[in-house]
Amino acid sequence: MPDSRHLAAFFVAALLLAITPGPGIFYVLARSLAGGRREGTLSSLGTFCGGLFHVLAAALGLSAVLATSAIAFSVVKYAGAAYLIFLGIQMIRTRNTEPAALAGPDQRLAAIRRHPVLQGIWTEVLNPKTALFFLSFIPQFVVHARGHLFAQFVFLGATSVVLNTLADLAVVQFAGPLGRLFQKNAKFRSRQRAATGLGMIGLGLYVAASDSHS
């Protein structure tokens, strides 16, 4: 484990990055507004799992492929952007669909297939910039003299993911009640889901158009 000085510096830097608005926070915010606190919390759990995937990938050296291969980076980036756009389109198409608890068996099955945890996982896994972030940020706080580099990397990476998730959950707490209010009114729900869908599409287009290694 890194020494206390490195840990303190890492914690401050990771906390500042966690509370800085970015695609992850905006994604969780959109899901919270669309489905209330429960959907936002489950989406946060999904992005948490996706973040841990990137931590392990970076620790094992797999993420280095994205850093060295422009083709691999572009493929993952555009796949992630396409997935966000797909979610946005689906949200617009189903803006007038009943909540799963009131829907029939077929609609419940469809809702399960669109589970926010799985969507959160894929949204984070298909974000190559998360991989590059861990490759560039975490190594600055790894102390080679202390050895156990893999364990240090995983510990620091997991800590960063936890801080990001706590920031996401804070967003859920504020946005969730507003989302539940929308869910109680069919007209508001329809309009809000349409607006959220457009926001997801916009986020996907932003990811696709952004500079690859910024």
Identify the residue ranges that each predicted region occupies:
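Juxtamembrane transmembrane-helix termini in multi-pass membrane transport proteins
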Residues: 2-74, 136-156, 160-161, 172-179
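Juxtamembrane boundary at the C-terminal end of a transmembrane helix
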Residues: 5-6, 206-214
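Hydrophobic/aromatic residues within the transmembrane alpha-helices of Major Facilitator Superfamily
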Residues: 15, 19, 52-53, 79, ...
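Membrane helix-loop-helix hairpins that form the core translocation module of multi-pass transporters
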Residues: 38-116, 174, 205
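Residue-level signal for the membrane-embedded core of alpha-helical transmembrane segments
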Residues: 56, 76-83, 129, 133, ...
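Alpha-helical multi-pass membrane helix bundles of inner-membrane/thylakoid proteins
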Residues: 74, 87-130, 177-198, 210-214
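Transmembrane alpha-helical segments that form the membrane-embedded catalytic/substrate-channel core
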Residues: 87-91, 161-169
